[in-house]
Amino acid sequence: MVSMLVYACADLKTALDELPTFLNHSTDIEKHLVKVQSYESDCDRIYIDAAHALYADKDADPQAVRLSHALLDTVEEAMDSVENAAERVQALIAQSV
């Protein structure tokens, strides 16, 4: 999940770097923003599977489970924030066209 978050941030940064030239000529902004959404969807699936796996192990240390779930939540929330930023960039582009 963390590597997907890093890739999503990199694609968002690339899209933002291209934003000033968007109106002057064609860029790959949309491609990068779609990749961010794809990473977020993949991250959602991994989050659900990982959370289920955490609670499926009846012998797991409850404190370790809580900590692991908190870490999963943090990464998922960060990915949601990156997707939200990408959606805002898409809205700005739509208004400019």
Spans of features found by a protein language model:
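Cytosolic, long alpha-helical scaffolding segments
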Residues: 1-97
